[in-house]
Amino acid sequence: MGLIPHSIIRTLSRLRTEFMSKSGPLVFYEMEVAKKRASASLRYLTCLLVLPWVISILLQKSIEPWVTFWWNTSSFDILDFLEEENTLVIFGQIEELLLFERMIENYSETYSKPSSKEIKKKTNVIKLYKKDCIHIITHLFTNFIGFALLSTYLVMGQKKLAIFFSWIREFFYSMSDTMKAFSILLATDLCIGFHSPHGWELLIDWISENYGFVHNDRIISSLVSTFPVILDTIFKYWIFRRFNRISPSLVVIYHSMNE
């Protein structure tokens, strides 16, 4: 006889077999649930990446005819005033260009008598101006409606986003402190570091064009010189507050690599 009675060994073996037989389906069920959640989360993320382009194209094609009809039939005083002011400015620029052409080509006509070429150019300027206005208004409506739809889609899919972010957190925390610091430093330098002023210029210029703002180099330069600095300071403070309690060595490595 051994030190442990055979009855106890048989009992433990029976319990182990029963436990494994019960836990097997449970494990498969949990794996199946995790697989379905992962598939739903990936589909949601793919839709979230593709949806803005689809919404923009569909809304633009459906809204532009309405905006064109509204622009051609409406006669609001404010819009007429703005149209008149902008058209006069454009006319002034065209007149300067035409005067320069006259000086070069030595036209025999006097400047006070406009030629058919000048009238045609001014007519084209008016058409281009109206086309630009319709384009800007269409973009405004498209962006606001698209933003509302995407916000609703994000609110409805918070659980799926939470699953995706849990994967990212799990992957991030599974790395070593050196790799964590390297990943954080790479992301900050690419997005808000001193290596990305041109990217910020393109982003701000794209936003201003989509929302109908006039391109202004001074405003863009001031935003590029201040906004990334503020974001960088906030991000460093967040790293210090969050990771100083979880992993102080990560904060030390990050500051050493950043220097």
Curated annotation (Swiss-Prot):
GO molecular function terms listed in the Swiss-Prot or TrEMBL record: antiporter activity; proton transmembrane transporter activity
Subcellular location: Plastid, Chloroplast inner membrane
Protein name according to UniProt: Potassium/proton antiporter CemA
Species per Swiss-Prot/TrEMBL record: Welwitschia mirabilis
Keyword Transmembrane part of the UniProt annotation: yes
Protein keywords: Antiport, Chloroplast, Hydrogen ion transport, Ion transport, Membrane, Plastid, Plastid inner membrane, Potassium, Potassium transport, Transmembrane, Transmembrane helix, Transport
Catalytic activity line of the entry: K(+)(in) + H(+)(out) = K(+)(out) + H(+)(in)
Highest taxon, organism lineage: Eukaryota
Example GO biological process: potassium ion transport
Membrane-spanning ranges: 47-67, 136-156, 184-204, 219-239
InterPro entries, per database record: CemA
GO annotation, cellular component aspect: chloroplast inner membrane
Gene that this polypeptide is encoded by: cemA
Keyword Membrane attached: yes
A Pfam cross-reference name: CemA
Cited function: Contributes to K(+)/H(+) antiport activity by supporting proton efflux to control proton extrusion and homeostasis in chloroplasts in a light-dependent manner to modulate photosynthesis. Prevents excessive induction of non-photochemical quenching (NPQ) under continuous-light conditions. Indirectly promotes efficient inorganic carbon uptake into chloroplasts.
